[in-house]
Amino acid sequence: MGQELTHETFVYYLLNKPQGVISATEDSRHKTVLDLLDETARHKQVFPVGRLDIDTHGLLLLTNNGDLAHAMLSPKKHVDKIYQAKVAGIMDEEDILAFEKGIKLKDHTCQPAKLEIVSVDRNASTSLVQITIAEGKFHQVKRMVAACGKEVADLQRLKMGPLSLPNDLELGDWRRLTQEELDALTIFGIPLA
């Protein structure tokens, strides 16, 4: 009586991407997110769903399900991404309103976004903020903060859609999605198995 083997069509990994690693499948100069996975995971030909800048850390989903990736990245879906930023400068009510209206950048006006001030250190002239955006333009969070006259010193992605960065997932570590996390992804209406 042999055990029945199941073949997985799609796999899903949650990575806590460290700084200094790029969100690509291959690169000749930098370590990539695939370099952090084991051979079994790499063999599944996964790719990152979206990108985090080389100096941004935090939640990154890797999968080989192109339909899900497309749905999660589609501008029509308005998938929220939540970042925590340490900012050089004091973010204030004026900045919150600017984010709500949509920050004007050189190449486009951002969709309205949410800026929440978590804490302010007036002595060090720094702020800790959470920023929620539905877009994913090049260096968008950093550029939005810069448009307010401040600078992002550290940027971490905490959430993407229904997925949250687990507190117990160390930088550079990864794991398969839990059944609960997979169930949460069904909101995109894409077959996951």
At which residue positions do the language-model features occur?
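Basic, flexible Lys/Arg- and Gly-enriched helix-loop patches that mediate nucleic-acid binding at interfaces
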Residues: 1-193
